Amino acid sequence: MKFEYQRKQMVESQLRANLVIDESILDSFSKVKLENFLSDNLKSIAYIDDNIFVNQDRFILRPFILGKLISNLNLKNNSTVLDIGSCTGYSSAILANLFKKVYSVENDQYCFEENKKNLSSEKILNVKLFNNNYLNLDFEGMQFDNVLINGELNDDPLFLINLLKPNGKITAIFRDKKNSYAVSYIKKQNSFDKIRIFDASSPLLIDCKNKEPAFTF
């Protein structure tokens, strides 16, 4: 009952209060039990209004930021989404209620194993999980309608352009020299239209300038 109450409060005071108003997204956050994607020592902070670090480097995004990033994707029941930096599986579980198929990528081995276990325990069947370097993704010509990046980038994600369908969208947090903010990239031929969508920050997930994920073990 405690988690149920906290989850309801999170939806109302963190998501809806920050203008995440799509009822399908709110419904997904209401259904998915974040505590089930955390180790026992972290369950007590499951619905805190902050990022949750599951080990020294990997984290689950703050709920309202995750919700707003998702709300800026192309939300269609028959569309696909690539979930980059899915950590222990929470973001993929949220997306699984909104998209036909979720392709989930996590580079940290511990998080990947927890992710696999959690998705199985929750009986989520429309997520396909990969343990990959984020900057070297190869889906053998497959293209996606959407890409969600669960953290900050320090450069535009040109390495993803061939993975997007025409007019496909990427949402992420972008860090420039002075500020961090959420962005939406829309594929136009061989380039992106880049749109600043709201102020936000998170830990760095992909270090594009060093051509390797920020956190690799």
Feature map (PLM): residue ranges:
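N-terminal auxiliary segments of SAM/dcSAM-dependent transferases
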Residues: 1-41
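A general structural signal for well-ordered alpha-helical segments in protein cores
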Residues: 7-8, 66, 92, 182
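Conserved SAM-binding loop and adjacent beta-strand
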Residues: 19-20, 35-42, 52-70, 74-75
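Generic structural signal for secondary-structure transition and capping sites
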Residues: 34-37, 124, 169, 202
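Short, surface-exposed polybasic-and-hydrophobic patches located at secondary-structure transitions
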Residues: 43-54, 169-172, 179
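Conserved nucleotide-cofactor-binding alpha/beta core module
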Residues: 74-196
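Substrate-binding/catalytic lobe of Class I Rossmann-like enzymes that use SAM or dcSAM, i.e.
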Residues: 182-188, 194-217
